[in-house]
């Protein structure tokens, strides 16, 4: 009974914290604890890329309906209540156009200044493992015991806990609002590349410079 009461109070406190005005948070205050990075990192670049792709039909359409990009950001922020991996996989499957086709990259002229976005690639995170050689299998004779291999059960993806889900949604909702407001109020919004604004702005919101426990901004 005591555990149930404590859980209810934690849920109420987290819900109240989520409803606190988003406009009161600055970019630095939107930073979340490092243990949530593993949930935010795979989603951040995909949110920016997908929302920028939906608004890539032209700067004129964007200027006529500036709420379109904000709506896309809010939609993805609300959908992040589900497990991040499931949302990421579903969204990638539903994409009809590759971001590289929507935003073609021009080759950097020789001697020109190279931007960090020139190496931009939209791919899920991958881990490189060192090469590992299996030991040679022993030769089995007619009198050798029978070796039975028991397959290990598949590892199911871990769902976010209630508190982690609320914290993640709050952080992403705050950062998407900051990103949309920053990119849509830029003086050259009609002629600038939205992709060049969305990804760095989202990175800066989640991983602000000078954060005590922060890591270098991720590259989408």
Curated annotation (Swiss-Prot):
Record's keyword terms, sorted: Nodulation, Signal
GO biological process terms held by the UniProt record: nodulation
Region spans: Disordered: 99-120
Top-level taxon of the source organism: Eukaryota
Pfam families the record matches: Nodulin
Signal peptide from the UniProt entry: 1-17
Stated induction or repression of this protein's expression: During nodulation in legume roots after Rhizobium infection.
Membership in a protein family: Belongs to the nodulin 20 family.
Protein name: Nodulin-23
